[in-house]
């Protein structure tokens, strides 16, 4: 076997391989012997068919199969010998084959980039320092009560957290536009569902009033014909409602799994959940900054084959989220996923190099801790832990999570890490 390697462009490589004629003939004869042992041909007993008959009937197909097998096997031998690491599926380009002569073919593919980590000392990470205060717990209890609240009619003016039922009709330059009209539209104030100025224009009015508000559509609005346009909305305010918050009764508290039904028990449970969310948010914030810094400090070429593969993964995930099938996933435009796919490939390559250079392996205690932390959010944590322990795929996924955390910690060990005091709400809003 003769081998030559050339760079086509960037990460592209072409390996040209020549297989000696006698190697091909030896392999063909060997395979024909195997075929002769198995085939049945009228007039001959099984295994007693003359080789010339077998060769005449099966020689062409056997030769083709043997060539395919030799091309694959010799390519693998070549890249092992040349210490080449292909990324993605190779493209075989066979040359002209003539029986009795050497056979030359080429294989085109991309290789993984050579990654040499640098600039880790320049990465800056700001670690949030947060504690869950009594006021934070009070705020979460208020949120829980609001989620369970009943709505009752209100005689007064619309306030920031009320709910209104309205008819509205919008126009630009005196002309109504598509989607600008609705009847009996229920709007919970303060959730940012409408364009800027819409809710503000309703506040202070009472049920039964009809009025006009002036707003301007944002420049980034999805409808091209409305971007940046001034509009008028005629509003008929039909109903105003306010929340009627439930009291923290024993019955109410038990809905949240607090068996003794006490306020103290509920506060303890809420605090525990908030601290779990907080720990995850701090980890994610630090990890995000570390990875951003790692990517910024290390520009690398990315094999197109890996990006294409990642785009397919993102397409399937998107289709699953929206109830689509495999075919619909493939029809989604690649432009929707290309940037995210490239980012994921780059991050994977860089963290992979961190893992390799630091000889990291998933720490069993960390894996156990991650599973227990995740399971604590469920009603029966021990059942969840047991389920993970009996599922190889889930355990492998959790080991990958642990290994990624360890890689991020290796980056942080060399980065410039500072601390910044912040509040629970500020941090959680950054995560949203």
UniProtKB/Swiss-Prot annotation:
Gene3D superfamilies linked: 3.10.50.40, Trigger factor ribosome-binding domain, Trigger factor, C-terminal domain
Protein localization: Cytoplasm
EC number: 5.2.1.8
MF terms (GO), sorted A to Z: peptidyl-prolyl cis-trans isomerase activity; protein folding chaperone; ribosome binding
Gene Ontology biological-process entries: 'de novo' cotranslational protein folding; cell division; chaperone-mediated protein folding; protein transport; protein unfolding
Gene Ontology cellular component annotations, sorted alphabetically: cytoplasm
Record's catalysed reaction(s): [protein]-peptidylproline (omega=180) = [protein]-peptidylproline (omega=0)
Amino-acid biosynthesis in keyword set: no
Keywords, alphabetical: Cell cycle, Cell division, Chaperone, Cytoplasm, Isomerase, Rotamase
This protein's record includes keyword Cytoplasm: yes
Uppermost EC category: isomerase
Pfam families: FKBP_C, Trigger_C, Trigger_N
Transmembrane parts of this sequence: none
Domain named PPIase FKBP-type: residues: 161-246
InterPro entries: PPIase_dom_sf, PPIase_FKBP_dom, Trig_fac, Trigger_fac_C, Trigger_fac_C_sf, Trigger_fac_ribosome-bd_bac, Trigger_fac_ribosome-bd_sf, Trigger_fact/SurA_dom_sf
Predominant location: cytoplasm
NCBIfam families: tig
Domain notes: Consists of 3 domains; the N-terminus binds the ribosome, the middle domain has PPIase activity, while the C-terminus has intrinsic chaperone activity on its own.
Record PANTHER family: TRIGGER FACTOR CHAPERONE AND PEPTIDYL-PROLYL CIS/TRANS ISOMERASE, TRIGGER FACTOR-LIKE PROTEIN TIG, CHLOROPLASTIC
Cited function: Involved in protein export. Acts as a chaperone by maintaining the newly synthesized protein in an open conformation. Functions as a peptidyl-prolyl cis-trans isomerase.
Protein family according to the UniProt entry: Belongs to the FKBP-type PPIase family. Tig subfamily.
Protein name as it appears in the record: Trigger factor
Origin species: Enterobacter sp. (strain 638)
Gene: tig
């Amino acid at each position: 076997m003769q081998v030559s390697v050339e760079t086509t462009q960037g990460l592209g490589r072409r390996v040209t391989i020549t297989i000696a004629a006698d190697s091909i003939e030896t392999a063909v004869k060997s395979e024909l012997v195997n075929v002769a042992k198995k085939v049945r041909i009228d007039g001959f007993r099984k295994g007693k068919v003359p080789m010339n008959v077998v060769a005449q009937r099966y020689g062409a197909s056997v030769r083709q199969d043997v060539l395919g097998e030799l091309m694959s096997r010799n390519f693998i031998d070549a890249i092992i010998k040349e210490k080449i690491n292909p990324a993605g599926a190779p493209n075989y380009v066979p040359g002209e084959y003539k029986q009795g002569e050497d056979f030359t073919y080429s294989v085109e593919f991309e290789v993984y980039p050579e990654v040499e980590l640098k600039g880790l000392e320049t990465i800056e990470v700001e670690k949030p320092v947060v504690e869950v205060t009594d006021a934070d717990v009070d705020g979460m209890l208020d949120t829980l009560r609001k989620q369970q609240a009943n709505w009752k009619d209100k005689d007064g003016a619309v306030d920031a957290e009320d709910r209104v039922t309205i008819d509205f009709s919008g126009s630009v330059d005196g002309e109504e536009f598509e989607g600008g009209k609705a009847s009996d539209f229920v709007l919970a104030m303060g959730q940012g569902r409408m364009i800027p100025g819409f809710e503000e224009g309703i506040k202070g009015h009472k049920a039964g009033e009809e009025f006009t508000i002036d707003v301007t559509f944002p420049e980034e609005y999805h409808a091209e014909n409305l971007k940046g346009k001034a509009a008028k909305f005629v509003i008929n305010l039909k109903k105003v409602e306010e929340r009627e918050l439930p009291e923290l009764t024993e019955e109410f508290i038990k809905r949240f799994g607090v068996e003794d039904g006490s306020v103290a028990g509920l506060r303890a449970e809420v605090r525990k959940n908030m601290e779990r969310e907080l720990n995850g948010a701090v980890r994610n914030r630090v990890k995000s900054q570390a990875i951003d810094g790692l990517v910024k400090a290390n520009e690398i070429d990315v094999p197109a084959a890996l990006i294409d593969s990642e785009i397919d993964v993102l397409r399937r995930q998107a289709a699953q989220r929206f109830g689509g099938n495999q075919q619909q996933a493939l029809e989604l435009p690649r432009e929707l996923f290309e940037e995210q796919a490239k980012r994921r490939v780059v991050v994977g390559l860089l963290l992979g190099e961190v893992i390799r250079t630091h000889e990291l392996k998933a720490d069993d205690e960390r894996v156990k801790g991650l599973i227990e932390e995740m399971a604590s959010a469920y009603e029966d944590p021990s059942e969840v832990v047991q389920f993970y322990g009996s599922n190889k795929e889930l355990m492998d996924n959790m080991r990958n999570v642990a290994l990624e955390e360890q890689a991020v910690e290796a980056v942080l060990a060399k980065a410039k890490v500072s601390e910044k005091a912040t509040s629970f709400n500020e941090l959680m809003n950054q995560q949203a």
